[in-house]
């Protein structure tokens, strides 16, 4: 006898038993009860043909189903991404203006900054999603002065969807270099430090040498 035929019958017997319990608790409608009666007759006929006892087959079917359910529960669930926010909705949606606008496209990201800003303390904040403890998708990054003015921004290009963690790190480096060129002091939020800009110093980034600053600033020379 085909083992699959036997196991199929056993599982059908157990599932019928489950449906019978549902009916016993008055949870089945008329079509449900009608199918239950018809399937009972079918199982009796199959059991007679196969020479199998329905009660014994029901117990075996239960073991099969329980084993499958245990295997399902043991499977690791797919990791879910988390959305992290440094900025409020107001900070994300606020319009801002630049006296000396500069812009650079770095792969799938657009970097904008105001080159007129000098000698300011600036913090970078971002809203983004995280998966496997790494930045997954940048929604928006903005640079704020201590007074709350927006002086820089990194945003995904709608025409080039998709970017990597390295794309974001490179764009942050360009923005920091451009801002530091004008003697601004730039800090990175703790959230960004953890997921997108890991480094050794308290500001969340290794200090740039003057040569590196000049190189970073040159990369952002193209006008808006």
Swiss-Prot record:
Cellular-component GO terms for this entry: host cell cytoplasm; host cell nucleus
Location of the motif Nuclear export signal: 131-140
Signal peptide: none
UniProt keyword RNA-binding, yes or no: yes
Region (RNA-binding and homodimerization): 1-73
Region called CPSF4-binding, residue ranges: 174-209
Keywords carried by this UniProt record: Eukaryotic host gene expression shutoff by virus, Host cytoplasm, Host gene expression shutoff by virus, Host mRNA suppression by virus, Host nucleus, Host-virus interaction, Inhibition of host innate immune response by virus, Inhibition of host interferon signaling pathway by virus, Inhibition of host PKR by virus, Inhibition of host pre-mRNA processing by virus, Inhibition of host RIG-I by virus, Inhibition of host RLR pathway by virus, Interferon antiviral system evasion, RNA-binding, Ubl conjugation, Viral immunoevasion
Region entry PABPN1-binding, spans: 217-224
Keyword check for Ubl conjugation: yes
Localization in the cell: Host nucleus; Host cytoplasm
Region (Disordered): 200-224
Modification after translation, per record: Upon interferon induction, ISGylated via host HERC5; this results in the impairment of NS1 interaction with RNA targets due to its inability to form homodimers and to interact with host EIF2AK2/PKR.
Domain of life: Viruses
GO BP terms: symbiont-mediated suppression of host cytoplasmic pattern recognition receptor signaling pathway via inhibition of RIG-I activity; symbiont-mediated suppression of host gene expression; symbiont-mediated suppression of host mRNA processing; symbiont-mediated suppression of host PKR/eIFalpha signaling; symbiont-mediated suppression of host type I interferon-mediated signaling pathway
Gene3D superfamilies: Influenza virus non-structural protein, effector domain (3.30.420.330), S15/NS1, RNA-binding (1.10.287.10)
Residue ranges annotated as motif Nuclear localization signal: 34-38
SUPFAM superfamilies assigned to the protein according to its UniProt record, in alphabetical order: Ns1 effector domain-like, S15/NS1 RNA-binding domain
One protein family per Pfam: Flu_NS1
Molecular functions per Gene Ontology: protein serine/threonine kinase inhibitor activity; RNA binding
Principal location: host cell
Domain note: The dsRNA-binding region is required for suppression of RNA silencing.
Oligomeric form and interacting partners: Homodimer. Interacts with host TRIM25 (via coiled coil); this interaction specifically inhibits TRIM25 multimerization and TRIM25-mediated RIGI CARD ubiquitination. Interacts with human EIF2AK2/PKR, CPSF4, IVNS1ABP and PABPN1.
Described function: Inhibits post-transcriptional processing of cellular pre-mRNA, by binding and inhibiting two cellular proteins that are required for the 3'-end processing of cellular pre-mRNAs: the 30 kDa cleavage and polyadenylation specificity factor/CPSF4 and the poly(A)-binding protein 2/PABPN1. In turn, unprocessed 3' end pre-mRNAs accumulate in the host nucleus and are no longer exported to the cytoplasm. Cellular protein synthesis is thereby shut off very early after virus infection.
Protein family membership: Belongs to the influenza A viruses NS1 family.
Protein name: Non-structural protein 1
The organism of origin for this protein: Influenza A virus (strain A/USA:Iowa/1943 H1N1)
Gene name per UniProt: NS
